[in-house]
Swiss-Prot record:
Organism field: Mus musculus (Mouse)
Subunit record text: Component of the DBIRD complex. Interacts with ZNF326/ZIRD; the interaction is direct. Interacts (via N-terminus) with SIRT1, which inhibits the deacetylation of substrates. Interacts (via N-terminus) with SUV39H1; this interaction abolishes the interaction with SIRT1. Component of a nuclear receptor-mediated transcription complex composed of at least ZNF335, CCAR2 and EMSY; the complex stimulates the transcription of nuclear receptor target genes such as SOX9 and HOXA1. Within the complex interacts with EMSY and interacts with ZNF335 (via C-terminus).
Modified residues (N6-acetyllysine): 112, 215
Gene name linked to the record: Ccar2
SMART domains: DBC1
Positions bearing Phosphothreonine: 35, 483, 896
Name of the protein this chain belongs to: Cell cycle and apoptosis regulator protein 2
Description of post-translational modifications: Acetylation at Lys-112 and Lys-215 by KAT8 prevents inhibitory binding to SIRT1 and increases its deacetylase activity.
């Protein structure tokens, strides 16, 4: 080292020194007593490397080589012991991983150096004529390199240049086996002190003859995430503390008392909420005039003691959900765009109050709605109809069902104290949807009204010119106000376009001041642009919990109908060997975990803190605690070991000595994956060889596929065993952990349910063959609660026979038949709509074919005319040719005698000349 300090390294032959202001080197301060030339113009890729990290990976030129050490680019010192492969020669290109230590005399020291194989012929440093470096270039790391005499295009560059990053993710790094331990930190940096461990592991791997996984292309997978609450969704009441426990990011008002979850009795497990009917609600544009409904928005005798509000649900219908799910299942070989999640397709129509999205509804009016809301349930329904018509322009009076979804209670302080109750209804909006004929007539009427009329326009222009100035100012202020409102709506609501066109299918049109917000935008969006009220957020969470319970119960009934999986007992010798291998692997993992550096520990802590809000809200699965779930750990020891191996960022083996050790040493910040993302990559590679232990003849219903898709937030195509067990445990039917494990084992292989590879059919699975005590879990074994009602028991108010015109009518049976007929009607309407689209497409094709035929016919006529013209031109040319030929023959006949006459004259002249010449004398 002292020799290196005293020695002044000469630059590479052929280089030039330039004077100027010294700038900081790309890799930090230069080594002590060295005066390397510093690059002044850094490329875009070089600027990307200035991120302040302690290690860099780059390619450079060996500028000095001695007995025990060398120098790369006159800045990076390396010992010959860190060279992998053959020793580099002076002037050769090498791949270097350097570490920065400001405490040493030479700050930049190489950790690994590798000579690049198959290098093209470099310039010889002796002849100066081959040096073609530009005058403004200086040598340094990633600066000017010696020019190549031969630069064939078939040799790709080592690091492809991109506008945003210098290093591209290598395609040689794969996670194709669960027993391939990663040895890189959470940010993709290789640990300097563990290079020997890498080499020893690789040598053992190769010596043992263990085959490497098949080389597969890297997939940009979405992180695995599930829509799942960490609590049971059967609590009938939530107070202040319960809301804070469930939704930690929710701001609860100070006057809030409690909320009663009425949807538990309105939609029991046996009669869940149906998404079968499409109900489309669209907000009209600002240009359309709102119809005068005649309803009073705020009467004088309004009483805040009772308020009635409605949840106006906009849903595409069950057939559209099935279509998206089947597209996702059918596109396994050639994946296309990921369809929208059901939470993004389900939307609520909300009103606005001081630029805040609020529920549609208002306070109770005794004079307009009724006198006693407690005794007469129709009073608050009238309030909801009146307020909804005044705020949205939608008439809900023809809705046939009004379900109580929730009841909010607020305490008004002051003498005397008052209890304010807000009742939220969920009406069947699909019953007020216009039919196809009505919708077509409405669209035609709007198109006729929107057509410009020149006579009326001119008359309006004349009237505007004769109007007084006061009316002009009033119109201007009104237009400015409407423009400001429209601008605010565009800035706040991201779901609505600037001027939404009328939908192709029937829809209910609402007023412009309303807004459509999806459940995903309310519940999942962590940075909402919309100011949402407290009640809207709570109702959205409750609606998602209701869907979670219904879809989870659908999975539960499907699992009950599947045959049990027969598990053969393991042999004692193999079991003992497997236990010994597991103990050895655990010890190896613990030893590797102890060697993790402080930087990696801090980075892991940061990643864990960033994921903690998601885990608290139930968006990411939490690891089981060591104290409270010892039995669950004992049952799923193998599954937890695999998950820990997938989550550990320090257990990765690289495939090649030369390429893979440097290929992923510096990853882009955007490609640094979270714990869930790394886990999804590990599982995706293992899913390809997963044995399908389910009976191939087993066909699941489509609603089960929709249930799987609902819980799979990012369309990964699979669900974990632990998440499926939690889905069953949160239904409220009091299953034990062992029961949930046995049910989930019917569709799980290797701790993962790959639901995308299962078979599905439209035929629904009948639940008649399942006994009631099995359908409702262990509720019959538990002591009855205060209300003593099963969640699957339907309300008994309308049961029995009803006399009508001297006969008894079974109302329940009639309603069931009406539901079946309505379902068939909706299915046929969907098929008719699909056939109409296909017919329209065929019509368009036929029209395009006709246009093409006409174009081809016109072109053929034009070609025929051109052909006739060419034939006429050919005939004219033939006539001219014949005429010229005759003239040439005539000229020949005339010129032949002249030629003979001239020849005779020449001969006669020659004879005369010969006679006149004197004879020579002797």
């Amino acid at each position: 080292m002292s020799q290196f300090k005293r020695q002044r390294i000469n630059p590479l032959p052929g280089g030039r020194n330039f004077s100027g202001a010294a700038s900081t080197s790309l890799l930090g301060p230069p080594p002590g007593l060295l005066t390397p030339p510093v690059a002044t113009d850094l490329s875009q890729n070089a600027r990307h490397l200035q991120s302040g990290e302690k290690q860099r990976v780059f390619t450079g030129i060996v500028t000095s080589l001695h007995d025990y050490f060398g120098v790369v680019d006159e800045e990076v010192f390396f010992q010959l012991s860190v060279v992998k492969g053959r020793l580099p020669q002076l002037g050769e290109k090498v791949l270097v991983k350097a570490a920065y230590n400001p405490g040493q005399a030479v700050p930049w020291n190489a950790v690994k150096v590798q000579t690049l194989s198959n290098q093209p012929l470099l310039k010889s440093p002796a002849p100066p004529l081959l040096h073609v470096a530009a005058l403004g270039q200086k040598q340094g790391i990633l600066g000017a390199q010696p020019q190549l005499i031969f630069q064939p295009h078939r040799i790709p560059p080592l690091f492809p240049q991109k506008p945003l990053s210098l290093f591209q993710t290598s395609h040689t790094l794969h996670l194709s086996h669960l027993n391939r331990f990663p040895a890189r930190g959470p940010h993709g940096r290789l640990d300097q002190g563990r290079s020997d461990d890498y080499d020893s592991k690789k040598r053992k791997q190769r010596a043992g003859g263990e085959p490497w996984g098949a080389k597969k292309p890297r997939h940009d997978l979405s992180p695995y995430r599930v829509h799942l609450t960490p609590y049971t969704v059967d609590s009938p009441t939530c107070d202040f503390l319960e809301l804070q426990r469930r939704y930690r990011s929710l701001l609860v008002p100070s006057d809030f008392l409690s909320v009663h979850l009425s949807w538990l009795s309105a939609f029991p497990l046996g009669q869940p909420f149906s998404l079968h009917h499409p109900s489309r609600i669209q907000v009209s544009s600002e240009k359309e005039a709102a119809p005068d409904t005649g309803a009073e928005p705020s009467p004088e005798d309004s009483d805040p003691t009772y308020s009635s509000k409605v949840l106006l649900l906009s849903s595409p219908g069950l057939e559209e959900f099935y279509r998206c799910c089947m597209l996702f299942v059918d596109d396994m070989a050639e994946p296309r765009e990921t369809p929208e999640h059901p939470l993004k397709q389900l939307k609520f129509l909300l009103g606005r109050k001081e630029e805040e999205a609020v529920l549609v509804g208002g306070e109770w009016s005794p004079s307009l709605d009724g006198l006693d809301p407690q005794a007469d349930p129709q009073v608050l329904v009238r309030t909801a109809i009146r307020c909804a018509q005044a705020q949205t322009g939608i008439d809900l009076s023809t809705c046939t069902k009004w379900w109580r979804f929730a009841e909010f209670q607020y305490l008004q302080p002051g003498p005397p104290r008052q209890l304010h109750t807000v009742v939220v209804y969920l009406p069947d909006v699909w019953t007020i949807m216009p039919t196809l004929e009505e919708w077509e007539a409405l669209c035609q009427q709007k198109a006729t009204e929107a057509a410009p009329q020149p006579h009326e326009a001119s008359g309006e222009a004349e009237a505007t010119e004769q109007a007084p100035d006061v009316s002009e100012q009033a119109d201007t202020s009104k237009q400015n106000t409407e423009t400001m409102e429209a601008t605010t709506q565009q800035d706040v609501d991201t779901d609505l376009p600037e001027a939404p066109p009328p939908p192709l299918e029937p829809a209910v049109m609402a007023r412009p001041r309303c807004v459509n917000l999806s459940l995903y935008g309310i519940v999942e969006d962590r940075r909402p642009k919309e100011r949402i009220s407290f009640e809207v957020v709570v109702l959205a969470e409750l609606f998602v919990e209701m869907l979670q319970r219904d879809f989870g119960y659908r999975i539960y009934k499907t699992l009950l109908s599947l045959p049990e999986k027969v598990v053969s007992p393991p042999e004692p010798e193999k079991e003992e060997a497997a236990k010994e291998d597991a103990v050895k692997e655990e010890e190896a993992v613990k030893e590797e975990a102890v060697k993790v550096s402080k930087d990696e520990v801090q980075n892991e802590g940061t990643a864990a803190e960033s994921d903690s809000p998601l885990k608290e809200d139930g968006l990411l699965p939490k690891r089981p605690s060591s104290g409270g779930e010892e039995e669950e750990k004992a049952r799923g020891e193998a599954a937890e070991d695999l998950c820990e191996m997938a989550l550990d960022p320090d257990l990765l083996l690289l495939r090649d000595d030369g390429e893979d050790e440097f290929a992923g040493a510096k990853l882009e910040e955007t490609e640094v994956r979270s714990v869930a993302s790394n886990q999804s990559e590990m599982e995706y590679s293992s899913l390809q060889d997963m044995p399908k232990e389910l009976d191939p003849s087993t066909v699941l219903p489509l609603d089960c596929l929709l249930a799987f898709v609902f819980f799979d937030a990012n369309w990964c195509g699979y669900l974990h065993r632990r998440d499926l067990e939690r889905v069953l445990l949160t239904l409220g039917i009091r299953l034990s952990a062992e029961q949930a494990k046995q049910l989930v084992s019917r569709v799980v292989a290797q701790n993962i349910c790959q639901y995308r590879s299962l078979q599905y059919s439209r035929a629904e699975v009948l639940d008649d063959g399942l006994p009631e005590d099995v359908l409702f879990g262990n509720l019959d074994l538990l002591p009855p609660s205060g209300k003593s009602t099963k969640p699957g028991a339907a309300p008994t108010e309308h049961k029995g026979l009803v006399p009508h015109n001297g006969s008894l009518i079974n109302v329940g049976s009639l309603l069931q038949r009406a539901e079946q007929q309505d379902s068939g009607r909706l299915y046929l309407e969907n098929k008719i709509h699909t056939l109409e689209l296909k017919l329209e497409e065929s019509h368009n094709r036929f029209s395009a074919t006709e246009v093409t035929n006409k174009t081809l016919a016109a072109e053929m006529q034009e070609l025929r005319a051109r052909l006739a013209e060419a034939e006429e031109t050919a005939r004219t040319a033939e006539r001219q040719k014949n005429q010229l030929q005759r003239q040439m023959q005539d000229f020949r006949r005339r010129l032949t005698p002249l030629h003979l006459e001239m020849q005779r004259i020449v001969e006669k002249a020659d004879s005369w000349v010969e006679k006149e010449e004197p004879t020579p004398s002797n």
